[in-house]
């Protein structure tokens, strides 16, 4: 998923709720975004997803997240 779209979904979920994305075949709420630099200087984009039933956070690669 593109970063801009994911950030828009995070904002929409924070203000209105009810937004879901899919990761590994499971529906999650978009919660936050994290940008890190790896030792080789490359950027790592991380999506932070919230599992609504278990109330836990899942950290995954942004490119593996799909719009639901």
Model segments located where?
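Mixed-charge, Lys/Arg-rich low-complexity intrinsically disordered regions
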Residues: 1-15
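Mixed-charge, Lys/Arg-enriched low-complexity segments
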Residues: 3-6, 63-68
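Acidic, low-complexity, intrinsically disordered interaction modules
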Residues: 13-65
């Amino acid at each position: 998923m593109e970063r801009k779209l994911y950030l828009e979904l995070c904002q929409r979920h924070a203000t209105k709720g009810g937004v879901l994305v899919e990761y590994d075949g499971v529906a999650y709420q978009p919660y936050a975004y994290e940008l890190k630099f790896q030792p080789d200087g490359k950027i790592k984009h991380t999506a932070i997803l919230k599992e609504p039933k278990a109330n836990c956070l899942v950290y995954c690669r942004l490119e593996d997240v799909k719009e639901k």
